[in-house]
Amino acid sequence: MSDVKKAVLAYSGGLDTSVILKWLQDTYQCEVVTFTADLGQGEELEPARQKALKFGIKPDNIFIDDLREEFVRDFVFPMFRCNTVYEGEYLLGTSIARPLIAKRQIEIARATGADAVSHGATGKGNDQVRFELGYYALMPGVKVIAPWREWDLLSREKLLAYAEKHGIPIEMKHKQGGSPYSMDANLLHISFEGRHLENPAAEAEESMWRWTVSPEAAPDAAEYLDLEFERGDLVAINGTRMKAHELLAKLNELGGKHGIGRLDLVENRYVGMKSRGCYETPGGTILLRAHRAIESVTLDREVAHLKDDLMPRYASLIYNGYWWSPERRALQALIDNTQESVNGWVRVKLYKGNVIVTGRDSKTDSLFDPTIATFEDDQGAYNQKDAHGFIRLNALRMRIAANAQTKRG
């Protein structure tokens, strides 16, 4: 293989990346650095360190980093400033995590003198694109090793056989032959793919869901939350200020209890195929609804409509892996500028899978003027006669077109 001296592997400690670790050592005969990111996935990460040590990885070459605050503060919250949704439904929980992982991998590569990076994404999915676009944007000359595009371990059986041959621990769920869901989790969401979900007509099993109760099993009593925003970002829940990752974790807890945030969809992958996935995004679902509500009283109409026009493009950039692109950065600068006035509070009611906005206001930036909007006597604040000329001017082009149509017969 090509001359690789040291490679930084995005390492979860699971079967796939453990096989990759051994394969890198055998195939490239290079030194391997492992990097495990804590993005709030709720798993114990120390076992990844112990597994890496068993593969002969030097202690100084094992990185387990708590990235929860950076993830929410610098990636999730900026994305939600745009009310970002891909294809009308998906809140991009997996997509938004990949640029941070790529960033940290490159930082570690520079710090350790590595000349290569590696990941465990398959050649069929979006993640290979997301990781590698990030690598090249941040370290143009880096060597990228994508084992799923190189090796011949193209079935679960071959992967298990390789693991057994090389003494790689195999979790009981794999030994029992049941093909588990392919899952990805972080503070924003948990996703499920595979098994019977590959039939888009089949309903997901209730036992699959991890973070949320079913709406039918949710409490019969609604729960109200007051959410405070500053410059478009959530800063407090019910008057209690917390760090960004703590806020999202709290919303996940509250939303999950009320059956909020389940999603079952078929999406268009960047590589060209359609795939079916199920997602739980309780906190993100609450955050999206509340953010739109505070914008409704603080954003100028045309600015709000411009954001809505740009959002699908922004969402596609994130979904397709272009977080580090100049066009995403340019859009972010515009979006962030619009958020200077997005300050205030929103009250939501959580009830059996629903997020219902019941109030919103801003003491400093509200554009809602009750003296003009009232249905009662406005004491001359708005002259209704002004509407006559406004309507006639806006109808002019349609009147001209209608007259022309009449002449044509």
UniProtKB/Swiss-Prot annotation:
It comes from Aromatoleum aromaticum (strain DSM 19018 / LMG 30748 / EbN1). Its main location: cytoplasm. The keyword Cytoplasm applies. Keywords: Amino-acid biosynthesis, Arginine biosynthesis, ATP-binding, Cytoplasm, Ligase, Nucleotide-binding. GO terms for cellular component: cytoplasm. The gene is argG. This is Argininosuccinate synthase. One of its GO terms (molecular function) is argininosuccinate synthase activity. L-citrulline binds at residues 90, 95, 126, 130, 182, 191, 267, 279. Homotetramer. It holds the Pfam family Arginosuc_syn_C. The lineage of its organism: Bacteria, Pseudomonadati, Pseudomonadota, Betaproteobacteria, Rhodocyclales.
